[in-house]
Amino acid sequence: MEEIKRLVLAMQFMTRLPIPIEIDVEKREFYRIASYFPIVGIVIGGILSLLYIALKDFFSREIVMTFIVAFSYVLTGAMHIDGLADTFDGLFSNKDKSKMLEIMRDSRLGTNGVLAAIFIVVLKILFLTNIHENITLTALLITPIIGRLSIVFSMMISKSARGGEGLGGLMLGKVGIREFAIAFVISIATSYFILPLAVFVKILTISLFVTYIVSKYISLRIGGMTGDTLGAVNELAELTALICFVSVSL
């Protein structure tokens, strides 16, 4: 029963899907929901796949993929791309660590954040458009899983830059190998039914490598990770996965 509660809480935390169930959880146990982040990715990928099937015969591929990317942000409340924008605002402000963290917390977007958000959206649409039609559904199903697993991986290898403050602080420094192992097994088990395991492992390895580099770079700059930078990790890991799918298409 506790695991079901954690799964429901993960869905409520990571999406804007209407799940009218009140879950009570102790703050010290909140980090355990990270194990189920890939299931959130499965649900998001499934919804995006259904949307693709519904639209592909009525609109051009470019228009369909624009709808897909836009709706992916509707499903998550744009929390990850907002984190990406805040991260770029902070990191490219040329300020010290404390000022960068303050800028990331500011609800107002700066030029760097706006440009980063625009670039990530445009690049996602471009790469989705150029994925071969035969593996489009596969890419739509797998990419959100890889993005969420990358968040778990980043939390496992990083500490909180804010000393445990914020939502990210509830999990950073607490998520360990157990949570990542569960998330990893869920991801592998799901991918087994969608694409060849060797292909998934290659795409996942590249995405996790990018996640590692990004996480270590950010940690070097601000002393750890935050909820915003975890959002950036998701966006960059998803983009990496899409690039890999395009290379598979060639």
Curated annotation (Swiss-Prot):
Cysteines paired by S-S bonds: none
Cellular component GO terms, alphabetical: plasma membrane
GO molecular function: adenosylcobinamide-GDP ribazoletransferase activity; cobalamin 5'-phosphate synthase activity
Keyword Magnesium assigned: yes
Keywords for the protein's UniProt record, in alphabetical order: Cell membrane, Cobalamin biosynthesis, Magnesium, Membrane, Transferase, Transmembrane, Transmembrane helix
Transmembrane portions of the chain: 33-53, 63-83, 109-129, 137-157, 180-200, 203-223
Catalytic activity: alpha-ribazole + adenosylcob(III)inamide-GDP = adenosylcob(III)alamin + GMP + H(+); alpha-ribazole 5'-phosphate + adenosylcob(III)inamide-GDP = adenosylcob(III)alamin 5'-phosphate + GMP + H(+)
Pathway involvement of the protein, from the record: Cofactor biosynthesis; adenosylcobalamin biosynthesis; adenosylcobalamin from cob(II)yrinate a,c-diamide: step 7/7
UniProt cross-references to InterPro entries, sorted A to Z: CobS
EC assignment: 2.7.8.26
Membrane topology listed for this record: Multi-pass membrane protein
Pfam families listed in its UniProt record: CobS
Cofactor(s) required, per the database record: Mg(2+)
Superkingdom field: Bacteria
Record function comment: Joins adenosylcobinamide-GDP and alpha-ribazole to generate adenosylcobalamin (Ado-cobalamin). Also synthesizes adenosylcobalamin 5'-phosphate from adenosylcobinamide-GDP and alpha-ribazole 5'-phosphate.
Family: Belongs to the CobS family.
Protein name: Adenosylcobinamide-GDP ribazoletransferase
